[in-house]
Amino acid sequence: LPLRTVMPSVTPVCFGTLYTGAQPAVHGIRKYEKPVITIDTLFDALLRAEKKPVIVAETDCSMSKIFLERNMDYYIFDTVAEVNAKAAELIMADTYDFIAVYNGNYDATMHKNGPEAPASLAALKANAEAFAMFYELIKSHWRQHNTLIGFATDHGCHEIDGNLGSHGLDMAEDLNIVHLYGAYPKEY
């Protein structure tokens, strides 16, 4: 699904919009900062519907900060490997209705090496492989549910001087993004 993210195209602003449906002026994050969002979010809607959401993310990333202070579970780890292992464990346990998993390894690597550097592409490939693993686990462990699975980036990126990567500008490379979704009906 081709989409266009919001400006400025930096992670906390973009995640604010992604999980609230509101523009930055409404959800309150207009620059790279990580306050707790206090307006209604997808997580709040799930909680009102008596669903059980969880966030699994890396320490100090936007996902581990801006959606805190809700009556839900948060699993915060220092490494992507720990994040992915916990996400796999939670999928297999089948105790949550919504699992938000955030891996910041491509973004971090892209900033240091450039968007298409071998190390950056390896991080991107690792994220695709993790998503494929989650997909297979969901297919085998969530058969009794109607399930929507998504791979949703928050912003794009571009190369800057010195072969580094960046984002945050009003340009196609930073704003044009693609989300991938799949739906799996409950098996009766």
Regions found by a protein language model. Name each.
Residues 1-188:
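Feature captures the catalytic ectodomains and active-site-proximal regions of enzymes
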